[in-house]
Amino acid sequence: MRLAFWLYEGTALHGLSRVTNSMKNVHTVYHAPQGDDYITATYTMLERTPEFPALSISVVRGQDLARGVSRLPGTLQQVEEHYHPEVIVVAPSCSTALLQEDLSQLSMHSGVDTGKILVHDVNPFRVQEHESAEGLFTGLVKRYALEQSTTEKPSVNLLGFTSLGFHLRSDLISLRRILKTLGVEVNVVAPWGAGIEDLRNLPAGWVNVVPYHEMGPGAAHHLREKFGMPSLQGIPMGVNPTLDWIRDLLELLNVIAAEKGLPSIEMPPLTDFSLDGLSAPSGVPWFARTADMESFSGKRAFVFGDATHTVGMVKFLKDELGMQIIGAGTYLEQHADWIRDQLEGYLPVPLMVTDKFQEVAKKIEDEMPELVCGTQMERHSCRKLDVPCMVISTPTHIENHLIGYYPILGFDGADILADRVYTSCKLGLEKHLIDFFGDAGLEYEEEEPESISNGHAAAAGSEGGVPDSGEAGDAGDTDGMPWSPDAEKMLRKVPFFVRKKVRKNTENFARENGEATITAEVFKRAKEALGG
């Protein structure tokens, strides 16, 4: 029944397609019913690249099952003839996994070179998107990486960048800029844009850089165990974490440089990392000290997402913007322990671990923070509650797959994050000013009701009768106490993004003090008692 609702993670099929669709000359064949070709549409809608997804469906039909035949061998032949890929990844869907067919045996009857075929026979009922993607990428690295001498100049591999990643291409540009400033070459980026030859050349790099905890650690572990390659797995999200990341990278590179008898790589002036080469690499340190941003020190924030962006965002909000973290959570249970370890001392309450968006929405409604950093699901939930929300993690909508340069990592990413936090919290004030001065010729508020309202009268526009979204979220609450017109007028002067919370607290105060109706006097007393 949960498939009728939003899910945070996609299927195993979606996960492995994120890897194969990232790579060159790699084609994926799904042994699946016709409906599972939705994945192709997902990439054409969201990825915003000129290439068509290298995905094909070996359609399973009831007729074929009755006859005891399979279309898989024929599909593999067609893919080989039309696309000539270096590797064909074959995988079952949830439906075809129930058939328990031997896909390896079926593939052998296709006539295609078996060395080109990789059967990724993952259990789609036990494995979801991230684990499937990580497993396939690690398997490809194990299969193709070859022993070879390292590059003459300092170089790194950037691992974990995949199709449909969160602001992936911008993050890649941001890290490339930093590496170029340091004089460090990029040996291979994988899986994004990599071919099989690139995977073979991975051991030529000096260090493996893995900025995402969900994708790449398995491959880096294998390269370390088999080829002795060191890896850097910090998250350069924010100004100070980026500086720490650069120092850690230089330390790893200089150890290898010393072994090769090469000079050490020195830390360049910070201005070299800026876009103009003259100013500070990020405006966050001074921006956080402005009067406008210092008001954020009292604001409460809740963060929910994948492992990487939850950890990075909590530290950014707390350490660099001075916001109060009231809680954090993730939908990736397998990474929960790592998140707890990374955020030790940051969270006042235990980490929330759930893949049910309703539980996250309830948490937000109970706490009513001034800012939520979450996924597309939290954006929808917060819209109903009039709580400011910024998306910092997958799953996302199309507005988070942008053509422009919007990194999350590095110095440039720190500026983007600060801007997003500021605008998410501040843009709602425009609507609040219309609420506040609505009777000053703006014709935003309707005339005050003559009789006592039920506590949920919504303001309407002068023409369309559109309810004020600040009150719309309360319209379905049948347990509200009656409010007098004067009290309603005072309530509308409260900013819309905390209005629901103020209404709830005031009604609780009135009940505790035996008041039957909330008047202006009761509202004032509640405000004084609750510290407002």
Curated annotation (Swiss-Prot):
Cofactor note (record): Binds 1 [4Fe-4S] cluster per heterodimer. The cluster is bound at the heterodimer interface by residues from both subunits.
InterPro entries attached to this UniProt entry: ChlB/BchB/BchZ, LI-POR_suB-like_C, Nase/OxRdtase_comp1, P-CP_red_C, Protochl_reductB, Protochlorophyllide_Rdtase
Protein's UniProt name: Light-independent protochlorophyllide reductase subunit B
Cofactor(s) needed: [4Fe-4S] cluster
Keywords of the record: 4Fe-4S, ATP-binding, Bacteriochlorophyll biosynthesis, Chlorophyll biosynthesis, Iron, Iron-sulfur, Metal-binding, Nucleotide-binding, Oxidoreductase, Photosynthesis
Residues annotated to bind [4Fe-4S] cluster: D36
Organism per entry: Chlorobium phaeobacteroides (strain BS1)
A GO MF label: ATP binding
